[in-house]
C-alpha cells in the first residue's frame, strides 16, 4: 500500500475525466495515434455499458491527452494507453494513481453497478478467449508480433472487491 504522502502526490499530479462527447474520444485517438477512434468496438461497448472510455490527465495540463483508459463499470481498467498505444516511462506512477482511483470508485458502487460488472467481466473473458483462439497478433508498432490477448491481459488492472473494502484509500480523487 502507498503511504499517505505518496497518495497525496498522485492526487495532486493526475485526474481522471470523462469525455463530454464522442468528438472528445475521436480527438483523443487522433492526438495519441491509437485505435480508440478507428473501430466501432469501443463505441459499441459504451452503448451496451460493458466498458467506458475515460481520460487520465496531468492536472497541470487537463486539456492535453495523456493516457486513454478503457474502464469497466466497477473501475476495472482494461487498457491504459498513451501515444502510439505505448505506456510511458511514468507508467508505475500512473498505475499507482489508478489503483487509488479504482478503490475510490469501488466504494461508490451500487447494486446495479455490481450486476453490470459481472456481465462486463464475462464479456471481457469471452473476448480474450476469442482473440486468443484466433491467434490475433499485433501488426505494427512496439508490440508487433505479440499476441493481442497477452497484451490486454498484461494491461488489465482488476482490483478485487475485498481489496477495495479492506484497504485505506485517499478521501479525494477526481472521478
Which residues are covered by each model-predicted region?
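Catalytic-core elements of nucleic-acid end-processing and repair enzymes
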Residues: 1-175
